[in-house]
């Protein structure tokens, strides 16, 4: 795996101290990876937490790097949303329902971005890929996972609301979610 670190400990999404061109940076990484014979460009996954999650969303919208992403502890920033021209990508979005950094119900955050609500963020992906609008509902402990299938692209959108979790999703009473996230990603 590649574990990149943002300039000045953040990714440039507009409100951060960094002025780095993140799409260019990831183009450089991808170009290098493609020189290796073992690299499978059809199985590239993006996983991000918090600011990294917002970056993974941005890269999924502005490029065709990923076959699937996991956006953890953040949702879409207002003005950075997928459209019908966004390359197909499977999305696992996980948000803490008591997040005091990235508001679950959307709005201005303490990090200087205006976020969509968690549900509208997931529905933006659903609408962009023309998925079935009636989700399958699964429970993981006390957490609800809405699964949107039948997307035109053959992808899937999962919206996982972590009950009683703040910005740190890994709470003592929270089930282990890394296993389900990885199982989701490797299907695409």
List the predicted regions and their residue ranges.
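Primarily recognizes the serine-hydrolase "nucleophile elbow" in alpha/beta-hydrolase
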Residues: 34-89, 100
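Short, solvent-exposed loop/turn and secondary-structure capping segments
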Residues: 12-15, 57-58, 80-86, 103-107, ...
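Acidic catalytic loop of the alpha/beta-hydrolase fold
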Residues: 99-102, 167-169
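C-terminal catalytic histidine-bearing segment of alpha/beta-hydrolase fold enzymes
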Residues: 90-94, 116-117, 126-188
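Serine-hydrolase catalytic machinery in alpha/beta-hydrolase-like enzymes
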Residues: 1-45, 49, 54-58, 174-175
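Structured segments of extracytoplasmic/periplasmic soluble domains
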Residues: 29-36, 58-63, 72, 124-131, ...
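Alpha/beta-hydrolase-fold catalytic nucleophile elbow
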Residues: 5, 47, 70-73, 92-95, ...
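Short, flexible/disordered intra-domain loops and linkers
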Residues: 104-116
